Amino acid sequence: FPIIVTDVLVPKFTLTAEANAAEIASLVAQNPALAGIVEKSGGSLSAFYNPGLFTTMQLMFGGLSAVFAVCAIIALWRKDNPKYFGLGTTQKVGIKDYVDTLAHNRAIQMLVVSASTDKLFMSTKSNATVMICLFGIIFGNYAAYSSYSQITSIPICLISILLMNKIARQMGQKASMLVGTWGGIIGSIAITLFLFFFNPKGDASKFSLPAFRLIRPDTWGTLFTGWTTTALIFVLLVIAWSGVQALSSSIVITMTADCADYEVYRTGKYVPGLMGTLFSFVDKLVSSLAATVVALFYSMVGFKDALPDTMTPYSDGIFWATIGCFVLLPIVGWLCNVVAMHFYPLTKEKMEEIQAEIGRIKAEAAAKQA
């Protein structure tokens, strides 16, 4: 698939010295600036060694992030008012209140267990090394990873949004978490069995995707061409699997608000800062552990000094280490979800009771102020 490297269109994501020597020499002759990139990458030509690639990515994604941040501020502007949350009044909260919340708020305790294990194993699932091994070694076609990401992203988001809108509204957030969790477990088992019985073992001819790019309309017509059966089934399985399991990871943020309301119901104290800080800390901690978990898995199959890359030949050890990180470890996280949700007290009915009680407390506070 074409990649721009120092203003030259390189016909493949990575050109290797062994297989593409003449092609590399021709490109260097056209643009001598490529010579330094070839030297740094050991005779190969890869977009990863091109500073211009990362400059472009920084500007593009930084700009998009800024636009979306402004959109979020505009959307929340009118609702970001104390009368819509907590008790509608300012309260003094001390260290003793935080300690009591952590010690006795069963809802936040269980949600932290659920969210941390979910985050850890979702991070191993999407780790860069795991994707390199899955697409570059097992499928033998790392260039297909870009098409895979763009083809699956929108359907996964749509499925997640539709399910969340339907299930969370009718059954409550705890039920949504469990639906996403069991969907993730079932999907993981299905993908494991599929890859076990239809393992390409590095044969790129068995795994091919269209050269589709969301930002390039000229490629949209290729979406329905260039598929192999293995690739098509895998992509459909991943879309269904990821769309359903996204419920469990996406619903966590709104469940923290329920935990804050539960604390108001339990003690009369509103401590949203504690909830946000706790989740931010857990998120950063477990995200940093994901790379260590992945490294441990691959070290068990012989990669103690360096992790596999796209030039590493296929082996059964790599297959099982990748399957472990991609689908089996997430099952462990989802089983932790099931256990945590068993002890999570905030059902849909309980939240209705809590909201009624908070409404009563607010009314009493307003009457006193009047």
Predicted regions and their residues:
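Helix-to-coil boundary motifs at intracellular loop junctions of multi-pass secondary transporters
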Residues: 132-137, 170, 255-266, 300
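Hydrophobic alpha-helical transmembrane segments
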Residues: 55-67, 148-156, 221-245, 282-286, ...
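Substrate-agnostic recognition of the 12-TM MFS/MFS-like secondary transporter fold
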Residues: 1-21, 48-50, 60-64, 122, ...
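Membrane-embedded translocation segments of transport machinery
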Residues: 76-245
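Intrinsically disordered cytosolic tails
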Residues: 167-170, 201, 207-209, 277-308, ...
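Membrane-helix interface residues
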Residues: 52, 170-175, 270, 301
